[in-house]
């Protein structure tokens, strides 16, 4: 039976820090916490013998709990100065060991652990010093709680849990809701301690039941409960681990490989961990054949190159690994020698200037060369930005191969990859060569070579060109918007101060706002924390109808976010010379194959509201003789659903250009097409799109504001009307359960381990993924093929217009007026014919001087 160990990194390193005596290296680096953690780690390995291990860490950024409750963890003492630098040090050691390290902004280590534990069906062991994790105990999950130091550990299983606690695991949340938790500053019900809380839970089981029967409870306790009802429910939310926080749950990425690479032993020597350094059984002392997971220093030679003549004996046509860093360029020809071109940082250092170093390897970046790199787009960016050089070699991209083989998504650096596969970080070119050899074989086995060679690899070049092209921003419009929003904010602040009867009120101060709302205006009771009353969005939205000041505060925050995130947020990203924004496209992040972007994230701009429209008006064509052309797929996922399910009524409706939503409404509501109301059509549209995502009756009811029963009837009638769709969705789930993954029209795979979970909600989530992945992933495949085709047509027809942006199902071209008609024709032809289906793909074209006008 396979075993998975999940470790709360922050919790255990904290325990180790206080359990171990002070340890410093000769350079004064504190290491006691890392040393203690490593001892616990190796003890765990010998006792549990896990197949998979992951260590989760908190990030410094506020979590969703801080946003929910300002006082969350507010009473925590600052981290000791000697502990703070040991956390990144521990992460470095773990990554060298090839141990999976997880962290996620907005979530805590508990949430990461809970998500992985609940989305896998492997016997799981959680190591933590935080009792919150006890709520995760079930038939497949055991919690090892570190009570004191690093050796006093208590085991909690589903069999001994009630005996140890008098509760069932889920009641840990209920307990904290009632009695609070001083360590996390969870308030609970004031005046209710552990004994009283346990008594209540023995009788009523849950907080909800306590309040349902609060009339039975007598005296002061009843008063305390009634007075603190909102606080109890808030505390329950704060204490509940988020088991769906969005981290990668593919355990293949957590496989533990022992013994560990010699790089770990070298790190232990550097940290002066003599006992661990001398434990020879921990390390791989043998040389492994090429393609293995490690290679001893004795086997691979590193040779410093003094001139390009030394490399001239190697044919550039032979597949070669090449890596660029700030300190060196390394190249590996498959001969057991990694050639190194050192780059000096100052004139006094040994080595070459960057341009001199590049001249030595330049031959391997030009046409005719066959190379392997990690992230081709980044290599091209480095050469262009730092050396004004073009990268024209025929390049294989290890980052893309890894992405397609694992298809888990999530950004990965070369260092992460080397750690994952147990390679020396000091031999990057050799590691790239060897890992590529392993993964390309897997790529072929999985039938993904066409997707890699015909889509992802050429798309990398298209994205590079789009990043270079950039998007023109009307700086005048941006400044006008900035002034406009500043005026709106100023006006809102005046209104708020007038209603508060306080001309000096700082509207941006939660403390001052809280005092005005809850003490002066007496709007509700408010929850006072150490730093003042909570004025979070949840709190204010609950008070919106209570006083005219509340919606003004919410509006102020909305405009302020718009101002800071987009208007002011764009300004530092605009190239001062050209006035262009150059977003960066992420090709290997999402599990579905969709692209994302950053700096700025142009895919997150609101689409339908007025604010989003205002932002789009700021993006303009590059000159008076240019326009923006937007080409947007119409209902692409619904069209794919129709084709894949072979649903003739839907296929006929789409191919005839009829209103699919109106026809669906007519059938679901059993009325003639002529009698379909706008409300019926909206509801049918929600059903059509909801089906794609495996929507529940509850989700549909919430969307269209109806009862669960009515929503259930709509879904039932829909599937009776379109039985082919129901059969297709069921087949998607069956296929995924049988094979462990779903796949797209181009055979892109997404592995869905949630389908094997013993937890019903987790399995349901897996089923929804299985239903949706073939549609959402195929949509990504289609637009990627279209992007390549459009780019190739623009080049082959010698046009000057440029493809500049992809957002969801939309492509944007900055086109010359003289090329407007031909670009429109190219977009329509290439996008609508990207794949051959029974259903016509339709593209809606818009033209304008701004993105808003074109959209």
Language model features: what each stretch is:
Residues 468, 582, 587-590, 666-799, ...:
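Conserved catalytic core of nucleic-acid polymerases
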Residues 52-54, 105-106, 129, 301-444:
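Conserved DEDDh/DEDDy metal-dependent 3′-5′ exonuclease domain
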Residues 1-54, 58, 65:
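Non-catalytic, usually N-terminal nucleic-acid engagement modules in DNA/RNA processing proteins
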Residues 228-349, 367, 371, 431-610, ...:
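Conserved "right-hand" nucleotidyltransferase catalytic core of DNA-directed polymerases
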Residues 487-494, 498, 502-551, 720-768, ...:
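C-terminal polymerase-core module
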Residues 6-11, 128-129, 134-159, 389-407, ...:
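Conserved beta-strand -> loop -> alpha-helix junction used to position metal-binding or nucleic-acid-contacting
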Residues 332-335, 405-426, 431, 587-672:
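Function-dense linear segments that define catalytic or interfacial modules
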Residues 23-24, 74-247:
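Extended two-metal-dependent nuclease catalytic cores across DNA- and RNA-processing enzymes
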